[in-house]
Regions:
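Structural detector for short beta-strands of small beta-barrel domains
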Residues: 1-15, 67-96, 122-123
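Structural preference for solvent-exposed beta-strand-turn elements
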Residues: 2-9, 110, 114-116, 126, ...
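Generic structural motif
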Residues: 11-13, 25-27, 53-57, 93, ...
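Long, contiguous N-terminal structural blocks used for assembly/anchoring
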Residues: 13, 17-18, 143
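Acidic (E/D-rich), amphipathic helical modules within compact regulatory domains
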Residues: 16-68
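Beta-strand secondary-structure signal
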Residues: 19-21, 49-51, 87, 97, ...
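Beta-strand/loop nucleic-acid-binding surfaces
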Residues: 24-42, 99-131
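OB-fold/S1-family single-stranded nucleic acid-binding modules
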Residues: 52-82, 126-143
């Protein structure tokens, strides 16, 4: 995933694996807290080395995802809780990385279709997770 600096600030958390409100470059997000521990809630303030991700709870087809964003929108639209409708542009494949404006996220639904690069898509994000970035990512030779 491309390296970009963003300021992430914890505003409030209900605790580990629960709802948290964070600011990402001044954009407010509700996320699943993977930064706190079961024993200690994360205190408000700037967070270092965090990573955002989302699991794939429902499968979809990439051609439909492209059709669902005909106006080429780029944004995360809050649905409820930690769920979002993600509108963005595919910037790479294997894994598929989508630029949602202030966040670039890897989609768990991989594709090796090069024609997907540059396309605007809509994906449903059922749970936006925030955790510690331990630096472990897919090895380059497997991308």
């Amino acid at each position: 995933m491309p390296e970009t600096y963003m300021e992430v600030r914890m505003e409030h958390t209900e605790g580990f694996a629960r709802k948290a409100e964070v600011l990402v470059d001044e954009e407010s997000l509700i996320v699943c807290d993977g930064v706190s521990t079961p024993e200690v809630r994360c205190t408000p303030g700037v967070l270092e080395s965090v990573r955002f991700s989302y699991p794939s709870l429902e499968g979809f087809e990439w051609p439909q995802a492209v059709k669902d964003n005909p106006s080429n929108r780029v944004r995360l639209e809050h649905v409820r809780g930690w769920s979002y409708a993600g509108f963005g542009r595919v910037i790479s494949i294997m894994p598929v990385t989508i630029d949602f404006g202030f966040l670039q996220l890897e989609d768990p639904n991989w594709s090796d279709d090069k024609s997907l690069e540059g396309k605007y898509v809509k994906v449903m994000i059922d749970r936006l997770d925030m955790g510690i970035d331990d630096g472990k990512q897919w090895p380059e030779e497997l991308r």
